């Protein structure tokens, strides 16, 4: 029976970027492995788009198009493609004047921002978010989108993490990056550096520690995760008081709650120690503080994981790469890792 086998949905991403390319390349490499036989895969996007990228990349993948979402007909090892236009009529998903149903196209423009591409990317994401939020799929892998393009349709769009939290009604989420030897959770995400200090609050730090601790226990099967927390200022506390006022109290409170958390540590040492196995994860105060070290160690293998959602969500840690789109140059290693993690997490959580 397939009823208990988790379903993993993969969004289209911006079809003019490398999203469809890395998705299909990753699936081509993973399809013979045992892991994909433990899940049911569902690609969200027009069949014509996937077929065109299949040809561009000289792959020989076979697709099974399905007009409507029906779990009973989904089989492990098969690449099912859901017709997203028909899905809009089947599901109670609202449309707007900027995004009416009739504008969902089957063609796209390579290597540039366009409203046509944005419509396809947004339609796929909305379907994926709906399926995951309703528990109809257990895992969601999101291919890269161009945020500026999606803002043509949704002025509130900041990024995948914020969008999925909004759609699923989740108040507490965190962005964690898995680089293999190094895992990093961010306290602040997509904000200018000058606005970061205002976000370094005790409650916010405690929330990220708690989400990371719970996730490591549940999905990585680490009984007592060891979590390190970075300082905001150079050398731990020079030129600022955020450490004494916000970070230290957050760490001490979580220690009282029996969480194995340590710090704050200077950012110029802690990532090295964590990558050597001393800690299971690092809580970084801002985007580039955490991602600089992580991408140095795992530039083409890192995976973006959203903590706190009622479903598993992963994504490759790169963008649309318009400059190489359509040239069959993109490497799929990060997308492979994202799909593998989503499969493993969904199997464990199912």
Across the structure, where does each feature detected by a protein language model lie?
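Residue-level signal for secondary-structure boundary elements
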Residues: 172, 176, 347-350
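Glycine/threonine-rich beta-strand-loop-alpha-helix active-site module
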Residues: 152-174
